[in-house]
Swiss-Prot record:
Organism of origin: Synechococcus sp. (strain CC9605)
Topology within the bilayer: Peripheral membrane protein
Subcellular location: Cellular thylakoid membrane
Transmembrane regions: none
Catalytic class of the enzyme: translocase
Keyword terms, alphabetized: Membrane, NAD, NADP, Plastoquinone, Quinone, Thylakoid, Translocase, Transport
The name this protein goes by in its record: NAD(P)H-quinone oxidoreductase subunit O
Length: 84
């Protein structure tokens, strides 16, 4: 008798963000990150509200441009989510 390997259903991965996507920063992921520790103690609200445009994706990082007169920033892709 063959035992069935009933694995728990895998959690569906969110769609991968690509160049040109509108994104915002996930507050929970960012607040406990190395990037947050190296930045201002209080992050600006606009990064959590979005939208920012994903300009470049290199490995685990993405460059985001906000619709404001501020420099572009590099953030880990796991800290970004699609802006709805």
């Amino acid at each position: 008798m063959a035992e069935s390997d009933a694995a728990a259903p895998a959690k569906a991965k969110p769609a991968a963000l690509r160049k040109g996507a509108l994104v915002k920063v996930n507050r929970a992921a960012y607040s406990s990150s190395l990037e947050a520790g190296a930045s201002d103690p209080t992050a600006p609200d606009y990064i959590f509200e979005g939208p920012g445009e994903l300009l470049v994706v290199k490995g685990d990082y993405g460059q985001v441009r906000w619709n404001r007169p501020v420099p572009d920033v590099w953030l880990r892709m796991d800290q970004l989510e699609a802006c709805s």
